[in-house]
Regions:
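Hydrophobic beta-strand-centered segment that forms part of the acyl-chain substrate-binding groove
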Residues: 68-107
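Catalytic strand-loop segment that frames the active site of acyl-thioester-processing enzymes
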Residues: 15-54
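A generic structural motif
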Residues: 24-27, 94, 114-116, 142
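Residues located in well-ordered beta-strands
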Residues: 19-22, 89, 94, 109-111, ...
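Beta-strand-rich interaction surfaces with strong enrichment in secreted/lumenal proteins
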Residues: 8, 50, 95-99
């Protein structure tokens, strides 16, 4: 039995955009989350006609697992509020088959490579049945509340 809260307790996401089902582990530099590619899972709205998850969702699964890592650490430091993070980009993001296959329980692994103030870089992998399905390096940014407000105000005025 996991001693972690649900992913939604660490992320600012709500259904249907909350794409993770379980937090498996979080440590100083790593996190692992699970989700099943199934019509009965949180991924159901995004599956193709064959029940597969399109490969481009790999980036969001990785980003949300990074968010779980960040949210868990914030809670450990007594910071109760969930904050928004941003993906700056991804390097060498590969989903070799183009899809995350139907019926597979995905294990999303993230490992902190570098963190400097509000920037971070993570090596990420998505696996199922001991097979690596997607890999990449995801770079993130943690904006301040003021920066988020400015960004949303600019978006609302266009």
């Amino acid at each position: 039995m996991s001693h972690y809260l649900s992913p939604g307790d660490y992320l600012p996401h709500d259904a249907p955009m909350l794409l993770l089902e379980e937090v498996v582990s979080v440590a100083d530099e790593t996190a692992i989350c699970h989700v099943t590619v199934s019509a009965n899972s949180v991924l159901a709205p995004f599956l193709d006609p064959d029940g597969n998850l399109p490969g481009w969702f790999a980036l969001e699964l990785m980003a949300q697992t990074i968010g779980v890592w960040s949210g868990w650490h914030r809670q450990q430091q007594g910071q109760a509020s969930i904050t928004l993070g941003m993906v700056l980009g991804a390097r060498d993001l590969v989903c070799a088959t183009g899809v995350l296959p139907a019926g597979k329980k995905l294990s999303i692994h993230v490992k902190l490579l570098m963190q400097d103030a509000r920037f971070g870089s993570f090596e990420c992998a998505i696996q199922a049945d001991n097979e690596t399905l997607a890999t990449g390096r995801v770079n993130t940014f943690q904006p301040t509340s003021e920066e988020i407000n400015t960004l949303f105000q600019q978006g609302a005025s266009t």
